[in-house]
């Protein structure tokens, strides 16, 4: 199916046939439900398609056939001209009874160049997605909030603009005929419209980013500390977030079910906040991921960063994903000083979904994690509630150091001791409390130094640090 791009102008409405799947520059609602669509997959060489096929499965798209061509990809059309023509001829024969009947999508197993996308679209006459466009369609399907929709729209428009520029370039050089009588001038008008929308969306995103930053500053001033969950997509971040905070988030065994950041409180403490955000994926162009910069900042600009890794992945995938996660974390810091001080940041690692692993398999995964710079990886299972108490204690120790013992002094004059105890509950996480014979209360608590100092200074001498 070809997609038509319509440029609305004051006195004319010329139509442009644009690369199928461009999506972002098409007027109206973009398609979000691709369940049941049929596609063919083009692959060069002996590339591993496991992750790509997982993304396709998440979309509900059915791969009718995978077509391989040996050797390096052709810079002009991904497949060689002859092989691409064979695919095109076969697509034209997809009548009733043909194995490709109902195919309306061609998938390319690469981050294709605009030239390759245009060439495959021209040859096949159906919608074409490369890896980036597959991800953008997946993002679009999962974007539920205004923040997420804005981010996805920016990423789609940036991708579409590169294709429009390629079309304009080919029209200028005579490689293709002009569109609708408008030629390059009309395409340039479309690109100008895209640029204007991008400018507007970025202003909206910048405003949202400033609001997020102000909320983070307010939380810091109030004495709250933040734990950010980071990791490869589908590593179990949202499941752990739900378990630790009790705050509802979408939890699915699907890639990229989370696109925006959700902040909630650690269930046992009002002063520890948890941030769950979008997962990473390997080989996603920086320009695309940059559209989600504000969302990522909410989790990465934290007091403690927790890197989560799916322990059920085969060893090779496990290593690839933890390497990709480290690479993306390093790339997301806002300035060079943060990157240089990365080793000084509070950071820990946890292996998730360990319930199906043997002791030997878990030991091997821990060894790999240690080689990547995490000396004491934890092992947890949200589903079977394995290791969660140790995980929480490790987080609190990283944030606050050792627990603090304080004494609340009983007195008949002034404020009640229960009132001061309530202040302690609001400021930290009480591990143990003991009522003494004279009415004093001994409390063991996780608490940061700022909150502790505020408690003592506001207690009129009724709170002592032991």
Q: For the regions a protein language model found, what residue spans apply to each?
A:
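N-terminal accessory targeting/assembly segments
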Residues: 1-137
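C-terminal-of-GTPase-core extension/linker across diverse P-loop GTPases
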Residues: 3-38, 161-235, 241-242, 332-466
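Switch II of P-loop NTPase G domains
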Residues: 18-30, 50-53, 72-92, 278-301, ...
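Conserved beta-strand segments of the P-loop GTPase G domain that flank and frequently precede/overlap
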Residues: 41-44, 66-69, 107-109, 307-310, ...
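Conserved nucleotide-binding/hydrolysis micro-motifs of P-loop NTPases
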Residues: 46-47, 71-72, 111-114, 133-137, ...
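Conserved C-terminal guanine-recognition region of P-loop GTPase G domains, centered on the G4
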Residues: 53-55, 91-100, 111-126, 269, ...
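Short alpha-helix plus adjacent loop in nuclease-associated cores
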Residues: 134-152
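Switch I (effector-binding) loop of TRAFAC-class P-loop GTPase G-domains
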Residues: 219-225, 243-270, 281-294
């Amino acid at each position: 199916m070809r997609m038509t791009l319509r440029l609305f102008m004051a006195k004319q409405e010329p139509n442009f046939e644009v690369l199928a799947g461009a999506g972002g520059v098409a007027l109206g609602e973009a398609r979000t439900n691709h369940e049941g669509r049929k596609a063919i997959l083009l692959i060069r060489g002996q590339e591993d398609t496991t992750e790509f096929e997982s993304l396709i499965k998440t979309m509900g798209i059915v791969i009718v056939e995978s077509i391989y061509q040996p050797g390096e990809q052709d810079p002009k059309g991904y497949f060689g001209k002859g092989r691409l023509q064979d695919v095109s001829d076969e697509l034209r024969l997809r009548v009733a009874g043909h194995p490709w009947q109902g195919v309306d999508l061609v998938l390319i197993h690469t981050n294709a160049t605009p030239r390759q996308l245009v060439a495959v679209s021209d040859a096949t006459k159906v919608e074409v997605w490369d890896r980036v466009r597959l991800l953008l369609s997946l993002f679009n399907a999962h974007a539920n909030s205004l923040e997420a929709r804005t981010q996805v729209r920016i990423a789609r428009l940036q991708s579409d603009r590169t294709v429009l520029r390629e079309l304009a370039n080919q029209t200028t050089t005579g490689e293709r005929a002009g569109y609708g009588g408008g030629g390059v001038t009309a395409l340039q008008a479309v690109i100008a419209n895209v640029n204007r929308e991008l400018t507007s969306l970025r202003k909206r995103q910048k405003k949202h980013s400033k609001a997020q930053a102000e909320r983070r500053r307010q939380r810091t001033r109030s004495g709250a500390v933040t734990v950010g969950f980071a990791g490869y997509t589908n590593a179990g971040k949202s499941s752990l977030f739900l378990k630790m905070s009790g705050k509802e988030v979408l939890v699915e065994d699907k890639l990229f079910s989370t696109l925006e950041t959700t902040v909630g409180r650690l269930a046992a403490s009002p002063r520890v906040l948890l941030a769950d955000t979008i997962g990473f994926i390997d080989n996603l162009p920086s320009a695309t991921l940059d559209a989600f910069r504000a969302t990522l900042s909410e989790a990465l600009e934290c007091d403690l960063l927790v890197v989560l890794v799916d322990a059920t992945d085969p060893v090779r995938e496990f290593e690839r994903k933890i390497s990709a996660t480290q690479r993306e974390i390093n790339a997301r810091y806002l300035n060079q000083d943060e990157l240089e001080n990365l080793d000084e940041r509070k950071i820990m690692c946890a292996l998730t979904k360990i319930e199906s692993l043997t002791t030997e398999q878990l030991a091997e995964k821990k060894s790999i994690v240690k080689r990547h710079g995490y000396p004491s990886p934890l092992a947890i299972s949200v589903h079977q509630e394995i290791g969660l108490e140790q995980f929480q204690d490790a987080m609190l120790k990283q944030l606050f150091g050792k627990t603090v013992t304080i004494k609340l002094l009983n007195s008949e004059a002034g404020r009640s001791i229960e009132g001061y105890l309530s202040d302690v509950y609001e400021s930290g996480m009480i591990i143990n409390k003991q009522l003494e014979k004279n009415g004093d209360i001994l409390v063991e608590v996780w608490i940061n130094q700022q909150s502790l100092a505020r408690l003592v200074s506001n207690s009129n001498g009724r709170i002592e640090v032991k």
